[in-house]
Amino acid sequence: MCWLRAWSHILLPVFLSVALIQLIFNLSDHKTKTHHHWKRKIEAKYVEKECAQKETCPVCTRDKRCIWCREEKVCKKYCFPYSDCKFNSIFWANCNVDLFGIVMLILIVILALAFLWYCLAYYFYMQQHMALYARHGQVPVYNWDAPGDW
């Protein structure tokens, strides 16, 4: 697992420097930040009105800023996780799979990737330890099920 340690020595300073640069930019640009804050508030009110005018699911979900609530049959502004609808009746970006289904699909993909990573890590771990056992005098058994007399 030396390659993992080597990559961590390379990537950790890179990530820390990116985080530090981002922090410096955020602290130094206070005027623009307050300007964007008010601009976002005005835009949010506009989006709420715009979403409320849409009356069907396909029209509502075309706009990525809106969600369709199946129970109330109304289009609302997308504000995850704060919504008046139940989680399994929210449709975002499509009218076929609700938001609960999308989140479950994402979790399944993450679990599958984690399992694949675990299998690869175990494979490399076993390869490394087989080489160590062979160097210390233990020879792996190749013909375990071979028939014949000794």
From Swiss-Prot:
Keyword Glycoprotein: yes
Key words, A-Z: Glycoprotein, Membrane, Signal, Transmembrane, Transmembrane helix
InterPro entries: PTTG1IP (IPR052304)
Subcellular localization, as worded in the UniProt entry: Membrane
One GO term describing the cellular component: membrane
Top-level taxonomic group: Eukaryota
Coiled coil: none
Glycosylation sites: 26
Stretches that traverse the bilayer: 99-119
Cytoplasmic side: 120-150
Stretches assigned to the Extracellular side: 20-98
Keyword Cytoplasm: no
Protein name: PTTG1IP family member 2
UniProt source species: Mus musculus
